[in-house]
Every structure is written in structure tokens, then in C-alpha cells.
């Protein structure tokens, strides 16, 4: 059950510490998924590792690198000359933020990478990421833009003007 009242704000230092922990957690996920994939696919089944297994590894490394680099640059803290924390960076744990989508991409890639030890066809599940991106683009940008009224806005009637017109009509009768 959620606590009642206003959600407490977090200070710069707390955001800085949480960002460090979040980055450390996702780095462990990246390293773990790569270790499992390399151990199973490229060491145990080395003789059956194809060109596509190596390409999948390179693809996942590129996705991990881009996502992790983006997250770490968002969380970059600023310090003053005397070493005091000036800015804790963007909050990586903020809901509906860009970092949340980057974390989803890292998790999806890790899950697909580990499951692809069984079959390379599992990589087709990675198409969920661009599908989700297209969905968000449609819901937040394109859909409202296409469905917006393109005609001139209807003139708003002022209440005073409307009352005046009603009085004039009553006088005419």
C-alpha cells in the first residue's frame, strides 16, 4: 500500500548515490549476460558457432555500449572546485524518463542474449524494442498530431456578449 501524502523529494546526494548503484547494477547485468553468452556459445559450442553468433555478440555489445554510455552521461554529477556536490545528475530511477527506456533496452538485450544460447532465432524477440519505440512515437507524437483539428478554431462566445444578444432578442419580441 502506498504511503499517504506527498511523495518526499530526494536530495542531490541521494540521487547521486542511487545513480551510482543503478549504473553498477546494470553493468553487472551486462557483464553477466556477456559472460554466459561467450561461455556457452563461443567456448562450449565453439565448433558450431557461426558468423551470426559473432554478429549477435557485436550487436549486443553495441546496444549495451550505447545504452550504458547514455545512462552514464545522464547521471554525470557536477562537483565544485572544493569537491562539494553541485549537481547529482539526472535521476536514473525516475518513472517515465528516458533512462527507464534505456534500462528496458539493456534488460531486453540481456534476456535475449542469454536465451539465444539455445537458438539464434531468439534474436527476433529483439524486434520488440523498435516496436515499442514506434508505439511510443505514435501515441505521444504522431497520433495526436494527425488527429488534431486542422481547421480554424471556433470563435468563443463571451458570456457578456451572449447575454447582450439575448436581451436584444427579448426587446424585439
UniProtKB/Swiss-Prot annotation:
UniProt keyword Acetylation present: yes
| Keyword terms, alphabetized | Acetylation, Autophagy, Endoplasmic reticulum, Membrane, Transmembrane, Transmembrane helix
Membrane topology of this protein = Multi-pass membrane protein
Compositional bias (Basic residues) spans? 160-173
State if Transmembrane helix is listed as a keyword.
Answer: yes
Q: Which residues cross the membrane?
A: 25-45, 51-68, 105-129
What GO cellular component is one of the record's annotations?
A: endoplasmic reticulum membrane
* Signal peptide extent: none
Q: Which GO terms describe its biological process?
A: autophagy; vacuolar protein processing
Family listed: Belongs to the TMEM208 family.
The record's function comment reads: May function as a negative regulator of endoplasmic reticulum-stress induced autophagy.
Q: What is this protein called?
A: Transmembrane protein 208
Species assigned in the record:
Bos taurus (Bovine)
Cite the source lineage: Eukaryota, Metazoa, Chordata, Craniata, Vertebrata
Amino acid at each position: 500500500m502506498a504511503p499517504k501524502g506527498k511523495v518526499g523529494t530526494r536530495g542531490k546526494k541521494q540521487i547521486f548515490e542511487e545513480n551510482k548503484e543503478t549504473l553498477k547494477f546494470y553493468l553487472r547485468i551486462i557483464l553477466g549476460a556477456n559472460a554466459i553468452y561467450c561461455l556457452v556459445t563461443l567456448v562450449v559450442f565453439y565448433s558450431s558457432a557461426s558468423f551470426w553468433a559473432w554478429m549477435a555478440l557485436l550487436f549486443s555489445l553495441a546496444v549495451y555500449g550505447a545504452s550504458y554510455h547514455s545512462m552514464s552521461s545522464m547521471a554525470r554529477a557536477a562537483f565544485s572546485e572544493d569537491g562539494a556536490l553541485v549537481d547529482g545528475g539526472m535521476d536514473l530511477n525516475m518513472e517515465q524518463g528516458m533512462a527507464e527506456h534505456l534500462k528496458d533496452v539493456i534488460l531486453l538485450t540481456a534476456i535475449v542474449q542469454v536465451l539465444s544460447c539455445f537458438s539464434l532465432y531468439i534474436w527476433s524477440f529483439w524486434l520488440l524494442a523498435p516496436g515499442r519505440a514506434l508505439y511510443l512515437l505514435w501515441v505521444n507524437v504522431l497520433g495526436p498530431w494527425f488527429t488534431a483539428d486542422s481547421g480554424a478554431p471556433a470563435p468563443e462566445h463571451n458570456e457578456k456578449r451572449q447575454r447582450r444578444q439575448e436581451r436584444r432578442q427579448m426587446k424585439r419580441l
